[in-house]
Amino acid sequence: MKLGVISQNLEQFEFEEGLRYARDLGIQAVEVGACGLWGRGYCNPEMLLANRGEIDRWLDTFASYDLEISALGGHGAPLMPNKTVAEEYSREFRLTCEFMELAGLRRITLLAGLPEGAEGDTAPNWVTFAEWPFLRDTLEWQWEKRLLPYWREHGKIAADHGVTLCFEMHGGDMIHNPVTLKQLHDEIGPVAACNFDISHMWYQGIDPIEALYYLGPLVQHVHAKDILISRHNARVRGMMDSTSTEQFADRSWTYTLAGWGHDEATWREFVSTLRLLGYDHVISLEMESEYFEVEEGLEKSVSFLKPLMIEKPSGAKWWEIAGMDRAGGLTQE
């Protein structure tokens, strides 16, 4: 495993200055924003495709700082009822997939999106309460008429370019838990995988370890951030809290640094479970805390997570190195 960071947390620096900062911090990989809501300061696929000779130079710049590219970032609003927004995302997505094939990159992290609740609606509609039949009908319409047609089409585009869609299970999104992610995977095929962000499990009341076992090899990329739960707010608001994230003192929970909401033992179990399930890619830091300055947050996050990373393959077992007969001579002839 390697410790990475999202390029959004480096945008205060010029490109190479940011890569140097990340390397010196002990970071080994960068998840690079390329389309959707991500900034383009570290990757602009449209510009690079227009001057293809620059692609190798762009890749070489990361290598010169001993940094891998763990994925491209494409979080956006693909199912937005506003056609202008949705069409622009689709255009950027197609360009990004084309660029990824030329650059030899395989993973894109992204959101599945949130559509309207019925034909002609102008606002997205997140259905999480299905006691009433009309809400169940709304959810079925969203899956059958919007989510599945879109990602069948765009999943084929990605697959044609050798790209894996690493969907993040996120509140306010059609794909927000392991069951919905697995359902999408079953519907559109192996092009659909998971970008596992443990923080989104905690505020939804999902056991992250059980979620990892449920998803298994579908986990193809990992984010690392924590949540801090405000007990006195949570007791009266519940965890599905619509208070603005900027009003963090009034919320039931807020994003925080790894280790600042859940203890080291919890994070050790998370990292160990990833290894047990065969994950050996990047754990990508996100500094999204509203009450930390970005660089301080990154530095504290690296200091906490770096010692927990399992960096080397397991290799020879300890008892093999010791020259022991593990069977203890108890095998029957």
Please give the residue ranges for each predicted region.
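C-terminal helical cap(s) of enzyme catalytic domains, especially alpha/beta-barrels
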Residues: V294-S314
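A short, acidic, flexible beta-alpha connecting loop/helix-capping segment that sits on the rim
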Residues: L10, S284-V294, A322
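Glycine-rich, proline-tolerant flexible connector loops at the mouths of alpha/beta enzymes
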Residues: G33-W58, A112-E119
